[in-house]
């Protein structure tokens, strides 16, 4: 599951439908990607990061890896 993305989406009060529309995909398709059943395409990750004005790694890298990378 994309926990960082889910948390960010909820903090910014966006729905799955909002992000599906942003990516020009179905809400069900987006939901499956957020659940980790399908992978986000590279361009979709960049679109989402740009939309939220966040670093792509902060959204899509696993939290453990992101923390380890910051301390290096």
What are these language model-derived features?
Residues 1-3, 72:
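Basic Lys/Arg-rich amphipathic helical interaction modules
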Residues 3-22:
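Short basic helix-loop element that most often maps to the first helix and adjoining turn
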Residues 8-13, 50, 58-72:
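Short, charged recognition helix plus adjacent turn
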Residues 25-39:
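Recognition helix of helix-turn-helix/homeodomain-like DNA-binding domains
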Residues 34, 44, 52:
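DNA major-groove recognition helix of helix-turn-helix
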Residues 37-47:
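Short, basic-rich loop-to-helix N-cap that marks the start of a DNA-contacting helix
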């Amino acid at each position: 599951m994309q926990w960082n993305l889910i948390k960010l989406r909820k903090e910014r009060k966006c729905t799955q439908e909002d992000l599906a529309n942003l990516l020009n995909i179905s809400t069900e398709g987006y939901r499956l990607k957020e659940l980790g059943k399908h992978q986000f395409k590279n361009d979709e990750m960049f679109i989402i990061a740009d939309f939220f004005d966040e670093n792509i790694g902060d959204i899509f890298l696993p939290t453990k890896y992101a923390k380890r990378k910051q301390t290096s």
